[in-house]
Amino acid sequence: MAENSLLGKLDGLVSRFEEVGTLITDPAVIADMKRFVKLNKEYRDLEKIVGARSEYVKVLNGIEEAKALLESEQDPEMREMAREELDTCNERIPALEEEIKLLLVPADPQDDKNAIVEIRGGTGGDEAALFAGDLYRMYVKYCELKGWKISVSSFSEGSSGGFKEIIFTVSGEKVYGTLKYESGVHRVQRVPATETQGRVHTSAATVAVLPEADEFDVEINEGEIKWDTFRSGGAGGQNVNKVESGVRLRYVWKNPITGVSEEILIECTETRDQPKNKERALTRLRSFIYDKEHQKYLDDIASKRKTMVSTGDRSAKIRTYNYPQGRITDHRINYTIYNLSAFMDGEIQDCLDHLIVAENAERLKESEL
């Protein structure tokens, strides 16, 4: 086989793949959970690259064999078969090379994590809260389509419905890597139910998507956490307002980016079981701190890119939902969909796919492979 620069980049990774495969069966490594999880993720990532390399080598060999057959074979039928094989293999090469190049570009290390999603009504008062509720229902339906699990941590209802704020966790495969594109300001243009003149109003809601931190991702001195309990409201029953199942934690933490100490306040009324609420409040605390550290990673990426798809900038207007025209426009990629009702029913994958393609193009361009 002729010298191939792309294969040269992969040779060392094959050796590392074999090394990691041995390490994750070592009892000493298995006993070190933090190291084991890290190596397991590296193994899965390398497995994809090694698999793509094997297919690439197979196609390159097919090209060499077809060329050799054309040079040596006199039978017309055999020569025609060789030409067809050569054409087929040559057609596959560009896609395989792009796949390998993309796999070689470091992805966001948090993509495989679960996500904590926060939706807050912004400008627009009651209408903004109603729109925040619409976004929540949209994500619920999308998660149902994906087979993901949603667990609401806390919420504050709007006076006319919807939510002033709702925070929930989404669990499943590559949740953060998919939902991270939803971070930002979502703007809605429609006639509110309370509008008597039929005028179109503009409101907004903010979505923040955080990677859920694992226990060993962040070091927290649990002895410094101040806990309070309170009676949580609910739909009814004997437990309501009689058992202090709601929990509130306060934790003083030094922000590594600003260097300033700040108090983090988190409440959880997710279940009627106080220990479970404590556990989930701790998870949110870890995720909050982890997100701040992850934001530095995103800022570093943003400083290197001229165009950005998923920078994590939660103040950027990312999408407009225009009800009179039945359209949604994603401003990051200037992509418009004319099926708003289906979109609000959770059919958002097409838009996400376009965002993923745009970001992959950015990653390939900046990698200079």
Swiss-Prot record:
It is found in: Cytoplasm. The lineage of its organism: Bacteria, Pseudomonadati, Bacteroidota, Bacteroidia, Bacteroidales. Belongs to the prokaryotic/mitochondrial release factor family. The modification N5-methylglutamine is found at residue 238. PROSITE patterns: RF_PROK_I. This is Peptide chain release factor 1. Methylated by PrmC. Methylation increases the termination efficiency of RF1. The keyword Ribosomal protein does not apply. Signal peptide: none annotated. It holds the Pfam family PCRF.
